[in-house]
Every structure is written in structure tokens, then in C-alpha cells.
């Protein structure tokens, strides 16, 4: 089965948007932009998005698609004299999962 190009672009945009725990703004923004064409979009104080499809009328079945917008995240605590970074963990996850993984480092301006 060939995946629809629109769905592939959405998945790529969501995967590429930085979204460490507590800093999911860019992921929510991407989801909101894509969902705007589907129907009404509401957001609560926890940054949860609720998308109500325009076509959901009458006695049609309703389904829920649920997912997290956050990902594994770290904050740079300090930089050692040799250039190595010391991190503080955001959220709760297994630290061993990070060993030899690539990370994206951004400054306070998001650059």
C-alpha cells in the first residue's frame, strides 16, 4: 500500500519539530496547521489539541486518535573544559536509551 504524500509530509513535519517535554510549542503548531483543513481545532491549557472533523455528523462512528507531542529532552547544565556537554533530563525516560545517539542542541533563541 502506497502512503499518501500529504500524510508523509505531516509525519516528517511532526518528527522534525523539536518537542522536548515542556517545550512542545513547535509540534503543536505543526499539528494545528495540518488540522485546520480538517475541521475545528481547540487547545486546552495543557497544550492538548482536539480536532473535530467537519464530516462527523449524524450517526457515523467516532474514533479517537491519541498520541504524545513531547519527546526525549535534555537541558545543557554545563560545558566541560574539553567541550563535552553535561545534561539535565527532562521528563522520565531510560537514560540508557540515549547512549551513542545523535542529539540536536538549540540555544535559548531556538537556533
Show which residues each predicted segment covers:
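N-terminal hydrophobic/helix-forming segments and targeting peptides
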Residues: 1-111
Amino acid at each position: 500500500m502506497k502512503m499518501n504524500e500529504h500524510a508523509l509530509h505531516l509525519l516528517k513535519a511532526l518528527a522534525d519539530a523539536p518537542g522536548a517535554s515542556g517545550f512542545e510549542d513547535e509540534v503543536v503548531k505543526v499539528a494545528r496547521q495540518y488540522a485546520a483543513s480538517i475541521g475545528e481545532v481547540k487547545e486546552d491549557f495543557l497544550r492538548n489539541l482536539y480536532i473535530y472533523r467537519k464530516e462527523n455528523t449524524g450517526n457515523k462512528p467516532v474514533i479517537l486518535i491519541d498520541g504524545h507531542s513531547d519527546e526525549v529532552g535534555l537541558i545543557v547544565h554545563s560545558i566541560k573544559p574539553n567541550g563535552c556537554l553535561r545534561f539535565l533530563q527532562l521528563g522520565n525516560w531510560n537514560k540508557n536509551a540515549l547512549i551513542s545517539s545523535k542529539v540536536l542542541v538549540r540555544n535559548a533563541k531556538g537556533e
